[in-house]
């Protein structure tokens, strides 16, 4: 029983996070065994005895390793003993701590994810000590820690590791620069990580990363050059950060400034990036999993592994950026042997196809495609490996028969990237792509390119694009021997040089488009237009193994040649599908729609289809109708210029909504009755297959109502939000979420149309859009000065209402994180709505001078047009006053003092007086009239602080009249009498402004029970006192250099204190 109990206790590890079902492996048992052994050896010994005993024990190799691991265990699990243990291990180690470093390296590489939170923090502490004392081989531990700093992960645990490593590198910069490989790995890693830290919440970390990385690149550029072409790929993703933009300027226009041996960007692009750097951007665990998938899983059985991988590593929006890292790793690092190529193991192209086709983020998808074809662009058969270009051609070749959408998007991307990646050196890029295709044919990676390039399943536009870019590869195979190889042949002179000569580059602008080097992230809109985002079912069928046997077979040219070259892609797909018998009610109309593919036949089919119940269809019949319908609707939408060129001409407006998809909207607009289940299913599939359907519906209703109203001026046609709700229900999403997503997509697609629809959105979706910060942010990010002007016009005319008074303050509170330009635009729009100050003034105490200058500037202008009130003064004086004061409060008080001096003085005095108990102990204290009791009421110290800083801002007596009024004098006297010594000393100069006579009289007059204080009506004596006070104040501020204001105030306070004491004695 005791053995069992001890066994259970031993299972609780301080080093590793273990659950009840976890079994210890050899590593965990080894660490805990060594720790327990060391504890038994040194328990109860003094430091001297322990050192003597361990010095003898480490002479034996086995014991030396156990003792080193035991010490390592203590340092990682016991922060309080870590420093002492580190000292002990330096005394007894006989290999310069090489054993500890080796075991720590292995621990980080294999078990980092299982380390406890304490162990992770202690690991950073230990690394810092190793680097500080320059322990040998510590760079191996650092490199493995860099690998654990994963891309696409913004969790707090990962950010802690990244920032900790960054701090070590910054602190021990000299040590870092002594190791060129670690410099290269660090720069490569942090340039990649910066891409993921675009969230405003990570701004401080990102700035630190950028500053460190840029300085390291510039100072050690000769070490950076070997990073090669993938380093350029990463730099493109951060090119819009100002510091990296300047680096791009120097790389493109002034390369010698970076290093004398650097000849320009083409030098980097021709260097193949080492596998070690590609490897360092994958977590060790991720590397093991993807390597297992590519080496041990049979083709057709991979789906469950891919599902696990998807859930594990692609669960967050930020993780999409990992796909590019994985594709570059698979292409450049995983090179299967001939035996594996001949086996039934899943090929690399299938894994890459799955990674690309399952990506739903358009920017990440574009970057993933670039990663696939990146080596093609600079391919040199003399230097580069054919294994780096093989996956790209195979994924297109094997997908063309059953899943042409995959091949189509990749072919389109290859054509466009060849021309647009580096416009200045388009001829060189084209040579690289031509060399790739030439070697692919020579090595028989595929038999020929005709089944791919001339497939009838490609639409006509794409086939024309292929002819323009790869004309030579469309000729018969016998002529292929004359193609371009490594040098520039007449092909260049005939095709390439003409295009490049006609293009004029304006290199003064550093914009990557102008320099010829494109940014993939910036071209994603065009990519989205040509890419079909597949459904989950399509992704499964492409790369899950259902068609594995078919894809293994090499297709003959005869199998793919048909007489339907000129048929549209959708008709080719329909032609391949077997004819399905449908119900008589829809058979004729559906055939007409498939044949004619226009709005008229589509609406006729919908009219027949809508009333049919579920019992009218078998499942395969409904699937047949839906799949073909979605395909035709998608194909008949224009690839470009989907919106009208004119917003007024009926001809252009009517043409822009003449496509079949708009026929669905028209049908829904004119038919309000409830739909049967098959129609709802059809609607759901259309929403899933056409993500743009939401904003296209909004666009349709705007134009349709406009055109119908012109035709029939007697009848008013209005937006029907019920149709949009129907679409949201079909997509199974809330209307607010759908509206936000659709507006975001629309703004990215066409800003002008977005702004054109904006008044209708705020009118028809009033409850959702008004005071909606997310929609507001979408609007503010895209508008310029002219757009702001137009919005203000619409607001002034009553056509647009963006804000309502209730809840506006919450909207403004969230907008404080917006960019400066966005906030200035916001405040102009708020001002156009004539929002009363009382609706937003409660935010004043929350605004900070350093963080919210835009809001404070606007409030200052607003307050200049207002009179001081009890409420606004209370809120202003509730603001925290820094050591140098609050310039905002001081500015407002100075301005108001010029116009409303007496009123301002009375309000502040009342507020200050209310902070102290009444002079009569039996009277219940009430707040002064007009002062509301609130949780944000300023304290006495806050009021005094603001008054003190206001006093300091006054020069030569200007503005000092605030203090001479009777209520202020009494308030200062009351504050003085109720303050402790510390407060009196702090505000001695302020208290000195209270007149001596008033102080004495006030004390005596207030000593009687029930004695009223002087009212607003002033007698002659009070008037004389005010004059006296004013003269005294002026004396204080205009004293000459020989007299010290502080000394005068102190003496004044002493005199006043004596008189008060005497007055007390007299009253007694």
From Swiss-Prot:
A GO cellular component annotated for this chain's UniProt record is: cytoplasm
Region: Disordered; residue ranges are 916-939, 1001-1068
Q: Which residues carry this modification: Phosphoserine?
A: 1038-1039, 1043-1044
Keywords from the UniProt entry: Cytoplasm, Nucleus, Phosphoprotein
Q: Where located?
A: Nucleus; Cytoplasm
Q: Which domain of life is it from?
A: Eukaryota
Entry similarity comment: Belongs to the Integrator subunit 3 family.
Q: Which function does this protein serve?
A: Component of the integrator complex, a multiprotein complex that terminates RNA polymerase II (Pol II) transcription in the promoter-proximal region of genes. The integrator complex provides a quality checkpoint during transcription elongation by driving premature transcription termination of transcripts that are unfavorably configured for transcriptional elongation: the complex terminates transcription by (1) catalyzing dephosphorylation of the C-terminal domain (CTD) of Pol II subunit Polr2A/Rbp1 and Spt5, and (2) degrading the exiting nascent RNA transcript via endonuclease activity.
Q: How does it assemble?
A: Belongs to the multiprotein complex Integrator, at least composed of IntS1, IntS2, IntS3, IntS4, omd/IntS5, IntS6, defl/IntS7, IntS8, IntS9, IntS10, IntS11, IntS12, asun/IntS13, IntS14 and IntS15. The core complex associates with protein phosphatase 2A subunits mts/PP2A and Pp2A-29B, to form the Integrator-PP2A (INTAC) complex.
**Protein name per its UniProtKB record:** Integrator complex subunit 3 homolog
Species source reads: Drosophila sechellia (Fruit fly)
